[in-house]
Amino acid sequence: MIPDLDIFRSANVLVKQHGQDAPIHAAMRADAMLEKGDLEGQVVWKRIVRAVEEIQRTDRPSGEVLQ
């Protein structure tokens, strides 16, 4: 299993490259993995999608820290 830190690093790169479209790009990669039959790859990209969404989330309570 890929560590969460690596997932968030990948998500951060996508956000820097694609901005607000980063979740779409990650979801497209997840779909491509599924089409290839690479279920493990799809799981990784779904984790990246969630990490991108977390990075881009703006409604953080005061004091909440992004891990």
Write out the residue ranges for each language-model feature.
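Short, charge-rich, low-complexity alpha-helical interaction segments
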Residues: M1-V13, Q67
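Amphipathic, hydrophobic secondary-structure cores in small proteins
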Residues: N12-R57
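Short, charged, intrinsically disordered terminal tails
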Residues: E54-Q67
